[in-house]
Amino acid sequence: YTELEKKIMDDTGCKIYSGTGINNRLETQTTILRSVDDTPYYKDDLSNPCNISYTLCGQIGDQDLNHMLNKTMLDPKKIKNIYLYRKVLENGKCMGYMWYGKYELDRNNIRQVIHPDRNGHQRKIYLCTLTK
């Protein structure tokens, strides 16, 4: 394992994988979120690490709060712990990862905005607020 993977396992009790950006672990009521720099079809804002905007799951067309990954993450009975890490890109090349740690999800502050999808078409996306 890399040092970051070891840190994530130590902090969360969970292993991560490189698939989707929302990794729900129901057995530990934990979600590990990944934000990737310069992803034009998402609108993540990590400029203030204490108050982050994170785009929910869905790359093409309108996002759906009932999408399995979104619905599970937003359910306070299923998910109690939320963590975030960032994939740092420079000119499209992965330069490494940054661990942001544990956050609180403000489930009452889910905002819908218009933003391009993976194909460049305007669509509705959802942004959630993560706070330290």
Sequence positions of predicted segments:
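Compact mixed alphabeta submodule
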Residues: 93-132
